[in-house]
A protein has these predicted regions:
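A solvent-exposed interaction/effector surface
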Residues: 1-157
């Protein structure tokens, strides 16, 4: 909680990321309400080394096909970032990412994605991948929804 308490809400910033290995679970359509269940299923599947990591970062990728239709609450996969040297399914590509933190419930994703996309355009950049929701502080950390911290990331070019 403390690490993200000072994160400024709603401000778009850019950060260079190295390739980040992860394990994932992919479905045809993942609705927002199914994310927690699928993350638990994924965690169970990889429990041997996800427990070793401890405070691993988990997230979901917004489905680009649905996003192109203006639907923001459909996801293509859920994932746990792992660490180099541990088993993984894929890696988020290295590169520059536009980022934005927001607090509270997950029901305002469309609004936050709009702010992120506007910040990308204002910087003269273009999206180069789907929006990623990274759950920095969630129900596993606090039972107070107003303390949830989500980071949106989108690779840019």
């Amino acid at each position: 909680l403390e690490q993200y308490r000072a994160a400024e809400d709603g401000r778009v910033f850019f950060r260079r990321e190295e390739a980040r290995p992860y394990v994932f679970l992919e479905e045809d359509i993942i609705l927002e309400k199914e994310i927690d269940f699928l993350l638990k299923k994924l965690e169970h599947r990889h429990q041997d080394y996800l427990k070793i990591i401890g405070s691993q970062c988990m997230g979901a990728a917004v489905d680009e096909e649905w996003l192109s239709r203006g639907v923001y609450n459909h996801f293509s996969r859920v994932f746990f970032l792992t660490e180099p040297g541990l088993p993984h399914d894929d890696a988020l590509p290295a590169g520059e990412y536009a980022c934005l933190y927001y607090r509270g419930a997950y029901d305002r994703l469309e609004e936050h994605c709009g702010v992120l996309l506007a910040g990308i355009a204002a910087a003269g950049r273009r999206p180069a991948g789907p929006p990623l929701e990274l759950y920095r502080v969630d129900a596993h950390d606090t039972n107070r929804e107003e303390e949830y911290v989500t980071e949106l990331q989108m690779r840019v070019e």
